Amino acid sequence: INYEGKSGNGQHTKMCNQIAIAGALAGACEAMVYAKNAGLDVDVMLKSISTGAAGSAQMNNVASKAAKDDYAPGFFLKHFIKDMGIADEEASERGTRLDVLEDVLGICKKLENEGMGDLGTQVLIKHYKW
């Protein structure tokens, strides 16, 4: 447990986490789609890059589920949308542009509107016509 300082800082730290996850998740999905379209074995590619600088919990856990078309939720897309929305609002109030977060949030909202809100966040891969 880390002490984040004054009241409210823990909430802002949670928003930082969601912002970072949005980018990592989108990056993993885009890497997988590129690999598939380049004729690579996606599982082998994930093993290769997950131990290097691209490695993350999103790469190690969520991407491997997406590669298997396993959309069972570890974290619901609808809850991720809620958290990203809060982060986006907080950033806007501070005059901070978060382009990647806004893009991922928009894509996730589209997927939720298509009935995928109760699936895991790895369903983001479906945006790319996986």
Predicted regions, residues:
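Helical "substrate-binding/catalytic lid" subdomain
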Residues: 9-130
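Ligand/cofactor pocket segment of small-molecule handling proteins
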Residues: 1-7
